[in-house]
Each structure stands twice: as C-alpha cells, then as structure tokens.
C-alpha cells in the first residue's frame, strides 16, 4: 500500500511541483497517472521512491514512512520498489544479464556485488525474469546493441529479479513505437495480474491509460483533479484534466489494438 498524506513539493525557484496530494494506492492496483507536461507526474512518482524529497506531508509505504526513513531502513524499503524510466537506466557496456542482476544488489553483500559475484539462485532468477519478458536469448548481449523496446523489457526484467512488490514506471513507452509499446504494456499488465505487483505508471497516451489501468489519476498544476476507475475517464474528463480537448498526439490510436 502507498499512502500520500498532504504531500507538497516546492522547488527552490518557487515552482510548485505537488500541491497537497492525498492518495491511497492499494496492493495489486494498476494505476495510470495522466496530465500535461509539467503537471507533476514525474515529481509524484519520484517522491514515492524518495528520489526527491517532498517539502511537506508524509509518504507511507506499507504503513512505514519513506519520508523519514534513512540508512538501512530506506534501502530496505527501496528494495521492494522497482523503478522503470523512459531512458531505461541500463549500463550500456554491460550484458543484459548483468543489468538484470543489478536488481539483486540490495539482496546481497555489497562486497560480492562489486565484483559481480552473485549466487547461482540469483542468476537463475535473472534468467527466469528475462524469459518472462521474452528476451532470454539476449542474456549475454551488450545492452547497447538492443533496440529501445528490448532495453525497456530488460528494465522490467530487472524489476522482476528485484522481486519488487510495486513498480513505478515513468513514461516507459514514450520513446517506443506502437507495436513495442503494446508489448511493454502487456508485460507490465501480466506482472500486475499474475504476481499481484502494484503498478503505478505515468502515461502520455490517453487510450493506453484506459486500456491497461484499473484506476486513473489526473494531475493538473500539481493537484489531483480526477481519481477514479478507468471506465469513468471519458473524453470530457480528460478535457477537465488537461484544461482543453484531447489532441491527436495524445492518442496512440488503433495501431495498438
């Protein structure tokens, strides 16, 4: 469970990133966060994992405050949170397998992981994770040789190997073509339904949010302006979230179907 209580973020230049956010996300939900660029989507997601510090309020992960956590407690809390970024965050010169094994770092002694000395059970788990996202054949390929879609699937495999209880995905399909976008979204949905892993994802494309999410949260100027089931997110609702009618480039279109 993720709980945000009166969460605000004000940047040093005075820009308000988040404005008194109150949310509860239950285990096993698939939540899409939508809104215009600058609405606070990335700020919200990064605050959940303490990649940025909030200015006010509290964020609870499974009833423990990540806002006040530090040291070992913070590391242990982050171990349960898988992050997937738009730019993949892979070590390009390393093999796919080594990138996936990085998801096991928090489960092992630091000295061993510095020298890539992982137990065989971790290697087996990493290979199984690659198989689940249909990219096992690339295990010993350098990550720099993969397409964007393949790199994003490696990121998902890393979260699987991490045995994350929740996945936070920051516009993971933004740089992908429609076919690859569907593959990545299918992978995330499968993990959500089969493993009961909570997924919170920032999305640009409105129709993707409607198709894959069970719940949609709309942000505007750092505030929650919509929070409800995906089926209630009509074009009129999105007009309210965005403050204007939808544009063509905010719909991926029939190519995904």
Swiss-Prot record:
Class in the EC hierarchy, top level: translocase
Domain of life: Bacteria
Primary localization class, coarse: membrane
CDD domains: ABC_PhnC_transporter (cd03256)
This protein's GO CC annotations: plasma membrane
Pfam families: ABC_tran (PF00005)
Purpose of the protein: Part of the ABC transporter complex PhnCDE involved in phosphonates import. Responsible for energy coupling to the transport system.
Subcellular location field: Cell membrane
Keyword Nucleotide-binding on entry: yes
Subunit structure: The complex is composed of two ATP-binding proteins (PhnC), two transmembrane proteins (PhnE) and a solute-binding protein (PhnD).
Residues where ATP binds: 35-42
UniProtKB keywords: ATP-binding, Cell membrane, Membrane, Nucleotide-binding, Phosphonate transport, Translocase, Transport
InterPro entries: AAA+_ATPase (IPR003593), ABC_transporter-like_ATP-bd (IPR003439), ABC_transporter-like_CS (IPR017871), ABC_transpr_PhnC (IPR012693), MetN_ABC_transporter-like (IPR050086), P-loop_NTPase (IPR027417)
Membrane topology: Peripheral membrane protein
Protein name as it appears in the record: Phosphonates import ATP-binding protein PhnC 1
EC number: 7.3.2.2
Single Gene Ontology MF annotation: ABC-type phosphonate transporter activity
ABC transporter domain boundaries: 2-246
Gene3D superfamilies listed in its UniProt record: P-loop containing nucleotide triphosphate hydrolases
